[in-house]
Amino acid sequence: MQEDDICPVCGLPKELCVCEEVSKETVEKIKIYTEQVRPGKVVTIIEGLDDAGIDLQELASKLKRECACGGTAKEGKIILQGDHRNKVREFLIKKEGFSEDAIEVT
């Protein structure tokens, strides 16, 4: 068994590891909101995921593909170009397994 097949958090093989599911259940609040960066330009910001032990770069990549937009992950936030609040909320609930109660859209 290779070292990258073992979860660094719990030490179990990755196929038996449940750390990510447990961390998704214990997320306090994921905030999804928009912010105007320039006149006529809006970005969607997702924050509160860094506490869950989730790979922000990987999730940002999935969200960019789902929303067909550009974006980045930095400083504990995912920033997507455009207003994608509802798409992001549905994606996090249906495809990533987060609880509806843990997501706040403003």
Curated annotation (Swiss-Prot):
Record Pfam families: SUI1 (PF01253)
Keyword Ubl conjugation: no
BP terms from Gene Ontology: formation of translation preinitiation complex; regulation of translation; translation reinitiation
SUPFAM superfamilies: eIF1-like (SSF55159)
UniProt KW Protein biosynthesis keyword: yes
GO function term, MF aspect, one: translation initiation factor activity
Record's keyword terms, sorted: Protein biosynthesis, Translation regulation
InterPro entries: DENR/SUI1_TIF, SUI1, SUI1_arc, SUI1_arc_bac, SUI1_dom_sf
HAMAP family recorded: SUI1
PANTHER family: DENSITY-REGULATED PROTEIN, DENSITY-REGULATED PROTEIN HOMOLOG
Family assignment from sequence similarity: Belongs to the SUI1 family.
NCBIfam families according to UniProt: PRK00939.1
Protein's name according to its UniProt entry: Protein translation factor SUI1 homolog
Native source organism of the sequence: Methanopyrus kandleri (strain AV19 / DSM 6324 / JCM 9639 / NBRC 100938)
Organism classification: Archaea, Methanobacteriati, Methanobacteriota, Methanomada group, Methanopyri
